[in-house]
Amino acid sequence: MWYNDKWQTGVPQISAGSARRAMNEMLKDWIKQIKIFLLDMDGTIYIGDKPIGGMSETLAAIRASGRKVVYCTNNSSRTADEYVQKLKKIGLYGEGDEIYTSSMATIGYLNSLYRNKRVYVCATEAVKAEFAAGGIHLTEEDPDVCVLAYDTELTYAKLEKMNRFLVKGAVYIATHPDDVCPAPEVYKPDVGSFIQLLRCSSGREPDVICGKPFQVMGEAILNRYHVSPEQIVMVGDRPHTDIRFGENNGFHTILVLSGETDAHKAETLPESDTPDVVLQSLNDVVGEL
C-alpha cells in the first residue's frame, strides 16, 4: 500500500514502512469527516461470485464506526433488488437503500429531462421493469430516447432496433462507459463494447452517459443521501471510472488493487485518475476507522 501526493507528478519511491506511515497520515487528514463509503462492487468487494477475503468483517467494521455503506456500481445488468440478493448469496450484506446503480442514475436523469417521453431501453427484462417502475414510459417502436444498458440478454434483434432508432435521431443515453466487466477468468464485454459496435453501424456516440465517472450519478448520490462531497470517499478498482468519478464530484478517493488495476498500473496514472490513497484491498482501511 502507498500514498500519492497529488502535487507530485509521479508516485514517490519510498519504503513500505514509510509508505504505510504516509498513507495513515493522509487518511487521518480526512477519514473522520467521512459519512459514506461509496463502494464499487465488481473488483472491489467481490470478483464474479466470490467475495474478496475478509470483506464481510470489513463492511461490518465500517458500519460499526457509524459510517454508511453505499454500493455504487456501473453494472446495469441487475436491479437493486437483484444486487441485494446477490450480496446475501455470497455472504455479504446489503439493503435496498445501500445500492445505487447506473440504471438508477439513468432513471433519475430521464425523469428530470425526458418525463413522459417514449423510451426504448436495451436491457435485461428485470432492468426494463425497474425503469417502468421508476416512471419511465417504455416503448418498442418510434422512441424519443434510447437507453443502452449492460444487457446480458442482448440479441441481434435488439441491436438492430437500437441502430435503427439512433439513425433516425433518437436521443442516445448509455448507463455507463465500461468496456468490460470483471470476471474470474476472462473479462466480459460491457456497455463500452456495445457503444463501439453501435458507433460503427450508426455513426452515433451517446449524447449522455449517466454512470461513473460522470456527474449525473454523482449529483444523484449527493441528493439521495443528503451529504456534501467531502463527506464521501469513493473506493474502487478502476482509475478511469471510480477514481475519476470521485475527482469529478469532489469526493475523496481510494484505489484498491483487488480488481482491474495492479501496482504497476497504479504507478503510471494520469492526474485525472490519481487517487488520494492506494490500498491492496478495502480491508486495509479498517485500522484507520
Protein language model features and the residues they cover:
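Conserved phosphate/oxyanion-binding catalytic-loop motifs
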Residues: 75
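Asp-based, Mg2+/Mn2+-dependent phosphohydrolase catalytic module
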Residues: 15-20, 24-41, 46-65, 81-100, ...
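Short, positively charged and aromatic/hydrophobic N-terminal segments
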Residues: 3-6
